[in-house]
């Protein structure tokens, strides 16, 4: 009778490699889920004085900061009051107080999205070392007075949850636009028409495209 052999060391090695690969895949996914783009892409910053600055950029949805790269180091734009608009690929961002809103619809009634997510600790008390203070950096110097450097790696014991918010701007005032009731409060005189339009077109306002469709229609109401 043949003696059975058990390759326990090989099995253990296989299980360890599988766990490592799975963890690496999850980590890679987490490292990009809190940025708008999967990697830095070329963008431009239009200053209020008309000057244009160009850099490789992305947007951090946890800290709600515009990130750019200088000499291989990732930094955050500051002095937002001097910035008019940021353009990344075909997308448009405007500074609002201390964060950036992305423009989705431009008109008398404009629609913006606040790209945002929350960082959640899954139970490990160790802190998130996502940023460290540095001195002033001379790149986009007109934009950046005090900056932070960023680590793009998210610790394994943390994960992100979506916290995106939508806003409409009318007469230079921002209003929440995350539900039909919030939108109708901005147009109380057109609430019946808005409600009927949502029903007729079967709009789901959790869907960004449907929300855009509704705000485009709202612009017709205020002509």
Enumerate the predicted regions with their spans.
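Bacterial Sec-dependent N-terminal signal peptides
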Residues: 1-32, 214
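Short N-terminal segments immediately surrounding and downstream of signal-peptide cleavage
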Residues: 25-46
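Glycine-centered tight beta-turn/hairpin loop motif at sheet-sheet or coil-to-beta transitions
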Residues: 48-50
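Aromatic-patch recognition
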Residues: 53, 57-175
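A short, solvent-exposed beta-edge/loop patch
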Residues: 150-213
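Short, low-complexity, Pro/Ser/Thr/Gly-rich segments in the mature regions of secreted, periplasmic
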Residues: 211-223
């Amino acid at each position: 009778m043949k003696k059975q052999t058990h390759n326990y060391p090989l099995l253990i090695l296989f299980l360890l490699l599988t766990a490592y690969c799975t963890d690496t895949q999850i980590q890679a996914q987490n490292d990009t889920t809190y940025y708008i783009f999967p990697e830095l892409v070329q963008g431009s910053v239009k200053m209020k004085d008309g000057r244009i600055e160009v850099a490789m950029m992305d947007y951090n949805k946890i800290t709600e900061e515009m990130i750019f790269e200088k000499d291989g180091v990732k930094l955050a734009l500051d002095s937002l009051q001097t910035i008019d608009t940021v353009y990344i690929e075909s997308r448009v961002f405007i500074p609002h107080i201390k964060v950036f809103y992305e423009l989705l619809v431009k008109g008398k009634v404009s629609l913006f999205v606040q790209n945002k997510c929350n960082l959640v600790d899954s139970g490990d008390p160790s802190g998130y070392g996502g940023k460290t203070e540095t001195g002033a950096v001379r790149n986009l110097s007109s934009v950046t007075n005090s900056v932070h450097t960023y680590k793009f790696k998210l610790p394994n014991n943390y994960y992100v949850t979506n916290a995106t918010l939508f806003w409409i701007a009318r007469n230079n005032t921002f209003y929440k636009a995350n539900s039909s009731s919030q939108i109708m409060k901005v147009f109380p005189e057109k609430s019946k028409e808005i409600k009927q339009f949502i029903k007729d077109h079967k709009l789901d306002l959790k869907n960004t495209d449907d929300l855009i469709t509704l705000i485009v229609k709202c612009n017709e109401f205020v002509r």
